[in-house]
């Protein structure tokens, strides 16, 4: 391989430079001379070619003396020239040279490779950072034109809002708005641009750019403000939540997440977030202290109950031992229990709290009635307490149970029926005359008997069957409601749909069921529950068989009169001839109760 002047050609890979005497675009063009000179014979291979040094000269003279060029300098000039495109130089080799040692620059030491040199900002280390972007005026513009453009750019910068001036400079384009090929910013500059407190110019209105930047930093600014109140209400979450501007914002705790983000949360929003199902009953239920506070009524805790009347009952779960389950009602379970300090056997009724207003109303109603209504015809009240989400009511234990467990085959003894009817009438009379209370749930399961022959009322329209047997709880079609309660509508013949007379109807059905030993409207006699209710409302009322005395039949017939205004009240019933007849008669209620218990036990065995 030789030069045009037939001079030996040698290559040096340690020195490579391009002479600046001609423009970069002239390299390799016709008229330019590529000369290679040998500087050492020690690197000559067997074919005589030298790979010692390589130099490129763009002089058109072709002199061998011009082939020596100094190595490229690594120093950064104080005023670097504008970057220009560096041409790619391809060295052609003959077939013979390619068959020998290949000229591979990648096999050399990295420090010996030629590098592209770019201007670096003063005082900035570009190691490990992206390349510095070119200036805002690329191209081969003359110095005076560049100065004019810089002055124009500076004048425009002064007139722009300060928020834009803070994030722009003559050498750094704005992110998202600069020229193509803009480079990432250093972390310090990026942090400054993403400040949460954009600065507004005091003299100039906020520009669209500043608004868009502020909206991007704070998403709350993106909310529309032009919709009316009705639109705002429709978009608001359900519940008592008003996000109108009239609502004042409450201060936020400095340590809260909202405070660190610079947000003010309306108090209604805080209430909606923190609200739980128990919040609705926060005026009654205090979960921290474990207290139920029925205002102006009673306060329950784990140690007992205090009534507003001044009565207090101290009792707790640690003093009670559950013996057996007696039955289940609509809202709880009844246990036979032993009070250890006194040795008294009692009925313990557990009512599990549910987040319904009706449950709380029923609990306080029963507690209020039990502790006020002191009567030999109403079960005694021993106390109550609240623990582990349940209300426990302690009351008198009636060992013979409810009447529905004792009338098997029907009660043929009119004396037992009359004494039972008298006790129920006296209990209902006490509730109405002394406490203005209507029982609303008179039926055999709520009439209790003990082995001494005493008959007492329980379950005052609160929890359904107090000691209903488990087998009886499945009978949901039996209704003791008066026809006026079943009918849909308002008053009937000028009389309200529910009065004392409704309990009188229920009393008549109860006495009739005890005498017959079965419910007077047997479900198996009707095709559906609707047919059964229709018979109660529109059919002839049932009555006692002719085998019973006329007084007994008259008593039941008056109670079951379809016209509530023609039914007797409690005073008339208490003085009915049938009841008066057996008031002074010798009726052994204790023997009957014991015999019924014995018969029930034999049936169980």
Curated annotation (Swiss-Prot):
One Pfam family named in its UniProt record: Pkinase
Composition bias, Basic and acidic residues: 106-115
Keywords for this protein: ATP-binding, Cell cycle, Cell division, Kinase, Mitosis, Nucleotide-binding, Phosphoprotein, Serine/threonine-protein kinase, Transferase
UniProt-listed InterPro entries: Kinase-like_dom_sf (IPR011009), Prot_kinase_dom (IPR000719), Protein_kinase_ATP_BS (IPR017441), Ser/Thr_kinase_AS (IPR008271)
Enzymatic class: transferase
Biased composition, class Low complexity, residue ranges: 31-73, 90-105, 244-256
CDD domains (UniProt xref): PKc_PBS2_like (cd06622)
One record GO biological process: positive regulation of silent mating-type cassette heterochromatin formation
Any one cellular-component term (Gene Ontology): cytoplasm
E.C. number: 2.7.12.2
List of residues binding ATP: 326-334, 349
Protein kinase domain: residues covered: 320-579
PROSITE patterns given in the database record: PROTEIN_KINASE_ATP, PROTEIN_KINASE_DOM, PROTEIN_KINASE_ST
Modifications the protein undergoes after translation, according to the UniProt entry: Dephosphorylated by pyp1 and pyp2.
Domain of life of the source: Eukaryota
Residue numbers bearing the Phosphoserine modification: 168, 253, 469
Chain positions with Phosphothreonine modification: 473
Residue positions of the active site: 441 (proton acceptor)
Function: Dosage-dependent regulator of mitosis with serine/ threonine protein kinase activity. May play a role in the integration of nutritional sensing with the control over entry into mitosis. It may interact with cdc25, wee1 and win1. May activate sty1.
Protein known as: Protein kinase wis1
Native source organism of the sequence: Schizosaccharomyces pombe (strain 972 / ATCC 24843) (Fission yeast)
């Amino acid at each position: 391989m030789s030069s045009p002047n037939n001079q030996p050609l040698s290559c040096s890979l340690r020195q490579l430079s391009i002479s600046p005497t001609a423009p970069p675009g002239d390299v390799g063009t016709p008229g330019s001379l590529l000369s290679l000179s040998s500087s050492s014979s020690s690197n000559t291979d067997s074919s005589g070619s030298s790979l010692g040094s390589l130099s490129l000269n763009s002089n058109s003279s072709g002199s061998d003396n011009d082939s020596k060029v100094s190595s490229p300098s690594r120093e950064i000039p104080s005023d670097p020239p504008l970057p220009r495109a560096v041409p790619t130089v391809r060295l052609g080799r003959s077939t013979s040279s390619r068959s020998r040692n290949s000229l591979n620059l990648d096999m050399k030491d990295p420090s010996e490779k030629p590098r592209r040199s770019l201007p670096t900002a003063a005082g900035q280390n570009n190691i490990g950072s992206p390349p510095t972007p070119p200036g805002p005026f690329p191209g081969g513009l003359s110095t005076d034109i560049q100065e004019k453009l810089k002055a124009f750019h500076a004048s425009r910068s002064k007139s722009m809002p300060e928020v834009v001036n803070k994030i722009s400079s003559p050498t750094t384009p704005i992110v998202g708005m600069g020229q193509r090929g803009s480079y990432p910013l250093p972390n310090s500059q990026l942090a400054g641009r993403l400040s949460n407190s954009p600065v507004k110019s005091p003299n100039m209105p906020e520009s669209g750019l500043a608004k868009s930047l502020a909206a991007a930093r704070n998403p709350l600014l993106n909310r529309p403000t032009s919709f009316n109140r009705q639109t705002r209400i429709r978009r608001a979450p359900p519940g008592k939540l008003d996000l109108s501007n009239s609502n004042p914002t409450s201060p936020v705790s400095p340590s809260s997440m909202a405070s660190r983000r610079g947000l003010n949360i309306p108090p209604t929003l805080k209430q909606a977030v923190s609200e739980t199902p128990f919040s609705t009953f926060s005026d009654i239920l205090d979960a921290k202290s474990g207290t139920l506070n029925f205002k102006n009524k009673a306060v329950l805790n784990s140690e007992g109950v205090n009534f507003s009347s001044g009565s207090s009952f101290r009792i707790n779960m640690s003093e009670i031992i559950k013996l057996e389950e007696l039955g289940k009602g609509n809202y709880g379970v009844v246990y036979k229990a032993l009070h250890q300090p006194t040795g008294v056997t009692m009925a313990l009724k557990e009512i599990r709290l549910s987040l319904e207003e009706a449950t709380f109303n029923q609990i306080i109603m029963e507690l209020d009635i039990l502790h006020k209504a002191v009567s030999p015809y109403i079960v005694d009240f021993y106390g109550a307490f609240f623990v582990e989400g349940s209300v426990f009511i302690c009351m008198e234990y009636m060992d013979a149970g409810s009447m529905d467990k004792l009338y098997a085959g029907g009660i043929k003894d009119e004396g037992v029926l009359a004494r039972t009817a008298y006790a129920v009438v006296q209990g209902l009379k006490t509730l109405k005359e002394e406490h203005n209370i209507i029982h609303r749930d008179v039926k055999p399961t709520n009439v209790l008997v003990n082995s001494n022959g005493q008959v007492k009322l329980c379950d005052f329209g609160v929890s359904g069957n107090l000691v209903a047997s488990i087998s009886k709880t499945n009978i949901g079609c039996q209704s003791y409601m008066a026809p006026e309660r079943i009918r849909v509508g308002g008053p009937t013949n000028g009389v309200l749909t529910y009065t004392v007379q409704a309990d009188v109807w229920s009393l008549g059905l109860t006495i009739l069921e005890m005498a017959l030993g079965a419910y007077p409207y047997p479900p198996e006699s009707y095709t559906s529950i609707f047919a059964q209710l229709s018979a109660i409302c529109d059919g002839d009322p049932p009555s006692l068989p002719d085998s019973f005395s006329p007084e007994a039949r008259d008593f039941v017939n008056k109670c079951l009169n379809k016209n509530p205004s023609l039914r007797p009240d409690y005073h008339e019933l208490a003085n009915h001839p049938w009841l008066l007849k057996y008031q002074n008669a010798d009726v052994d209620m204790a023997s009957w109760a014991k015999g019924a218990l014995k018969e029930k036990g034999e049936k169980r065995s």
